[in-house]
Regions:
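Positively charged n-region of N-terminal signal peptides that target proteins for export
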Residues: 1-4
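Sec-dependent N-terminal signal peptides
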Residues: 6-8
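Primarily secretory-pathway and cell-envelope proteins
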Residues: 19-79, 84, 138-194
Length: 194
């Protein structure tokens, strides 16, 4: 009789355990589904945060930016004014960081994190590397914090670029080319390890 009671008790205990685990698992999935449903109803950012990166001979180069889209608008000379400092993205300043010193447009820049701004114009753009990468748009931009300014000539692209895009292409063991494109224009410049 004792054996029979022990077997029945063991069977009851074993049969109850999986039900509790399933209940906990079901509850966890229900909570997760609710979180997913809430997230599904939130609007997508019209200028999502993006990043591009590469490593050139051990130098990790990393760019973070917000990527606005054309959405039927005229960009250069419209949404983005000519001859004004532009964050070259949306929301916060675009940041560029690298783990080793490098050279841009003939100037040595120490490893670190910086803001990347531009001043678009119809014939020539000014590219700016600035110390203050933690700023909203160009609201706190100060020219005296620039560590580098140089000129580039924009090129017309064959296929319009709907969203602002940054790309870094490794050219060889020492150099890479940073390309920024949007609408029907692109600018490019060389980043070189020292």
């Amino acid at each position: 009789m004792k054996k029979l009671i022990a077997i029945i008790s063991l069977a009851i205990i074993c049969s109850c355990s999986p039900v509790e685990e399933k209940t906990k698992e079901t509850q966890m999935h229900a909570d997760h589904s609710q979180t997913l449903d809430k997230g599904a109803h939130q609007p997508k950012s019209k200028s999502p945060k993006q990043m591009t990166m590469t490593t050139i001979e051990g130098n990790h180069i990393h760019i973070e930016y917000h990527s606005p889209s054309m959405r039927g608008r005229k960009i250069f000379g419209g949404l983005v004014a000519y001859n004004e400092v532009w964050v070259t993205g949306a929301h916060n300043a675009t940041s560029i960081s690298f783990t080793k010193d490098l050279e841009i447009s003939g100037k040595k820049i120490e490893a670190g994190k910086y803001a990347l701004f531009t001043i678009p114009d119809q014939k020539e753009w000014t590219v700016i590397i600035n110390k203050n990468w933690e700023q909203h748009l160009a609201d706190d931009y100060k020219q005296e914090e620039d560590i580098l300014r140089f000129k580039v000539i924009p090129t017309i692209v064959d296929t319009p670029q709907e969203s602002l895009t940054y790309k870094i292409e490794n050219l060889d063991d020492l150099e890479g080319e940073l390309a920024i494109s949007w609408e029907n224009l692109a600018i490019k410049f060389i980043i070189k390890n020292i």
